[in-house]
C-alpha cells in the first residue's frame, strides 16, 4: 500500500506541493486532482521516489526509505521529466526503455519481439508525437510494467493528451484491477472524469484552511 501523510514539496517561495495526504492499495486506481501542472508533476515525482519531500511522509508497504519507493514505483509520461522525446520512433523508444530495466530482470528482452508479444507492432514505425492518446498510454504503461518489480504506477497528467477520459481511464482501471498482477495506480489529473465514483484526492487536502485561503488569490493571478 502507498500511504502519504502531510506530503509537501518545497518551492522557491511557496510550497510547490502543498500538504497532501492520500493512500492507494494494490488493486486500486486513485485519481488526484490539481489545477497546476507543476503541482501534478511534483506530486508524481514525490510519490514515485524521484523527488525528496520537503515534509511529511511517503511509505510503501510500511517502508519509508525512498529507495524502496523507487524500486516499486514507476513514473509514467511526466512532462519535462521522462515523457518520450518527440523525435524518437516507437521502436527506438522501446529499445531505450527496455535497456533501463535492471539486467537481472531484463533477460533477453529485445524491442522487436516485445512489440509483437505486447501487440504494438501496428505503431512500431510511428514517431512518439504521432501516437494516438490511447495507444500512448497503453504503450508507456506496458513499458513500465516490463520491470517485474513494478507494483506502483504513477502517471503525470494522462488527460493532457485528450479531453476524452476513454483514452486513458479504462487502461488504468484495467491495470489496477488485474487479478494476475494487482497494482496500485495513481494518476495526477486536472479534473475527475464525469461520473467518477472511485477513490479520489485533491492536492492540498492536508493544508491548514487558513493557508489555503491565503493562497487562492495568488493561484488565480497566475492563470
Describe each model-derived feature in a short phrase.
Residues 4-7, 15-25, 56:
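Conserved beta-strand
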Residues 30-33:
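Short hydrophobic beta-strand immediately N-terminal to the Walker A/P-loop
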Residues 35-100:
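ABC ATPase nucleotide-binding domain signature region
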Residues 79-139:
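ABC-family P-loop ATPase nucleotide-binding domains
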Residues 133-155:
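GG-anchored amphipathic helix commonly corresponding to the ABC/SMC/Rad50 NBD signature/C-loop
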Residues 149-151, 160-195:
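Conserved catalytic loops of ABC-family nucleotide-binding domains
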Residues 196-219:
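A short helix-turn-beta junction within AAA+ P-loop NTPase domains corresponding to the substrate/partner-engaging
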Amino acid at each position: 500500500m502507498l500511504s502519504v501523510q502531510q506530503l509537501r514539496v518545497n518551492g522557491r517561495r511557496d510550497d510547490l506541493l502543498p500538504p497532501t495526504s492520500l493512500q492507494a492499495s494494490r488493486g486500486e486506481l486513485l485519481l488526484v486532482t490539481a489545477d497546476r501542472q507543476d503541482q501534478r508533476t511534483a506530486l508524481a515525482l514525490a510519490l514515485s521516489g524521484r523527488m525528496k519531500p520537503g515534509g511529511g511522509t511517503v511509505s510503501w508497504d510500511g517502508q519509508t526509505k525512498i529507495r524502496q519507493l523507487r524500486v516499486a514505483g514507476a513514473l509514467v509520461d511526466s512532462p519535462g521529466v521522462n515523457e518520450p522525446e518527440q523525435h524518437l520512433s516507437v521502436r527506438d523508444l522501446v529499445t531505450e526503455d527496455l535497456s533501463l530495466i535492471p539486467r537481472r530482470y531484463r533477460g533477453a528482452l529485445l524491442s522487436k519481439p516485445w512489440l509483437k508479444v505486447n501487440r504494438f507492432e501496428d505503431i512500431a514505425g510511428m514517431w512518439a508525437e504521432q501516437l494516438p492518446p490511447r495507444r500512448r498510454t497503453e504503450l508507456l504503461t506496458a513499458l513500465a510494467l516490463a520491470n517485474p518489480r513494478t507494483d506502483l504506477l504513477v502517471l503525470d497528467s494522462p488527460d493532457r493528451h485528450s479531453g476524452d477520459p476513454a483514452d486513458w481511464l479504462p487502461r488504468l482501471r484495467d491495470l489496477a484491477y488485474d487479478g494476475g498482477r494487482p497494482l496500485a495506480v495513481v494518476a495526477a489529473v486536472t479534473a475527475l472524469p464525469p461520473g467518477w465514483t472511485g477513490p479520489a484526492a485533491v492536492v492540498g487536502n492536508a493544508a491548514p484552511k487558513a493557508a489555503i485561503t491565503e493562497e487562492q488569490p495568488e493561484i488565480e493571478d497566475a492563470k
